Amino acid sequence: MNALRGLLNKYTGNQIVFSNKYATTFFEKFPKLAFLNNVTNLAPMMKWSLSIVPITQILSGTKLPENIDVYQASSLCATGSIWTYYATLISPQNTGTRMLAACNAAMAACHGYNIYRRTKWEKSQIIPIENKN
């Protein structure tokens, strides 16, 4: 356990995501994009992408119900629900905690709706058995 702790110790408290020479020269060349190299900004953006992508797929109709992975949608719905609840417990409440709750509620809602779409599609595929009396 101490070996694992020692291995991960250099990453504790590190806010910088990309520290190689290519990334640093890129962010020096384009300083307006430097906020992407901070985990405080990049993590919420990645979290929102877990909500925005399914919402756009639902609205545009590009993801058909038969292509929805129920296990993935279930885990993301559960994660969104748990983190939404957790965000309401954080004290003190501020804009960051409210945005955390909103992001996770959106993730739970859109993936919950995808589960509904998939189960509705599966039920429509069941062929009723006719009575032969």
From Swiss-Prot:
A Gene Ontology BP annotation from the UniProt entry: mitochondrial pyruvate transmembrane transport
Keyword Transmembrane: yes
Pfam families assigned: MPC (PF03650)
GO CC annotation terms, alphabetical: mitochondrial inner membrane
GO molecular function: pyruvate transmembrane transporter activity
Chief localisation class: mitochondrion
Keywords: Membrane, Mitochondrion, Mitochondrion inner membrane, Transmembrane, Transmembrane helix, Transport
Transmembrane segments: 39-55, 73-91, 99-116
Membrane topology recorded in Swiss-Prot or TrEMBL: Multi-pass membrane protein
Source domain of life: Eukaryota
Xref: InterPro entries: MPC
Keyword match Metal-binding: no
Subcellular localization(s) per the UniProt record: Mitochondrion inner membrane
Function: May mediate the uptake of pyruvate into mitochondria.
Family: Belongs to the mitochondrial pyruvate carrier (MPC) (TC 2.A.105) family.
Name of the featured protein: Probable mitochondrial pyruvate carrier 2
